[in-house]
Amino acid sequence: MVKQSPEKLVKELETYENTPEFFYSIRSLDQQPGLHALTDIQRAARIIYLNRTCFNGLYRVNSQGYFNTPFGQYKHPVIANKPVIMAVSEYLNTANVKIVCGDYSIVLKQLPSDAFVYLDPPSHHGNFIVHLLYP
């Protein structure tokens, strides 16, 4: 939605509140059947909002796949960062960018030899996924 409808996305984000009550109502949507009824704009805004207002911007889900990072308690988070959203939209619309979600072993075989690739696999440590693992 950043690429196709940045203005609509910003407008949606501007309605979002920085309160624990609003945060937890948005966070809990993935536990309700209504999540699938949201528009693409609303789903994109939800992810951006949660990232900007949750603790340390940490995207984390529990074993059931539900987002479970707590409210970040920031005094003035920038939820609807219009200049950044517009700049990213312009870049995505003018550059040859392809964002892919898939098995890395398959995706890598489909790329040209001069492609820039970023892979972000989880690091497993016992029964817990470690977000940063240093040697």
Label the model's feature ranges.
Residues V2-Y118, P122-V130:
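SAM-dependent nucleic-acid methyltransferase catalytic core
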Residues L132-P135:
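Glycine-rich S-adenosyl-L-methionine
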